[in-house]
């Protein structure tokens, strides 16, 4: 990805964060976790935007599976003096470094990694979830419906349909757990084909109908999503 496209992505993500600022308590330290932070362009930008520009009392934790990347990010945060920004090697499913989190962020967490991040966010009671999914392979492997053969018979259409069905189900499952959700265009397709963002804000009002809708769709399409199973545990 070129620098210009990455810059556009980060700016767009910060716009989504600006929209949810009223959900964050400015008088109390807010904990934010960025799962699959990679080289942490977004993580550093979030810290600067929220801590330096907006004056929020925040702690940001970046998690990634790559040891060398985490070491590099920690060197940078020391260089810039970002004391409440920390990076750890690991995955969100097994991370136990905090008891509660105010906001969970994922940018292109691949396939079911997004599901583990969303499930963890729900269990933490996160007030805000911002997730840009990536590579929804799970549903694509099992999805089937003879009435949709004009779509299913063509690989690229099946892949896109499976991705849309997966993200729609994820949004509905979050609603079933007491979140108000939106699926928004993250950035123009010109810059990345992975251009949908799931934004969820906690309301504390579970929607049982939303869960039933996912159940019905899963049965019709022959899919069994990881997020659904994780939230049932």
At which residue positions do the language-model features occur?
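Conserved SAM-binding loop of SAM-dependent methyltransferases across substrates and taxa
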Residues: 39-55
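Substrate-binding/catalytic lobe of Class I Rossmann-like enzymes that use SAM or dcSAM, i.e.
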Residues: 134-220
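Conserved SAM-binding motif I beta-strand of class I
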Residues: 59-64
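S-adenosylmethionine
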Residues: 88-158, 183-188
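Conserved alpha-helix/loop element of class I SAM-dependent methyltransferases that forms part
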Residues: 9-28
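S-adenosyl-L-methionine
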Residues: 68-101
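Conserved small/polar residues in nucleotide/adenosyl-binding loops
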Residues: 1-3
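Conserved class I S-adenosyl-L-methionine
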Residues: 28-38
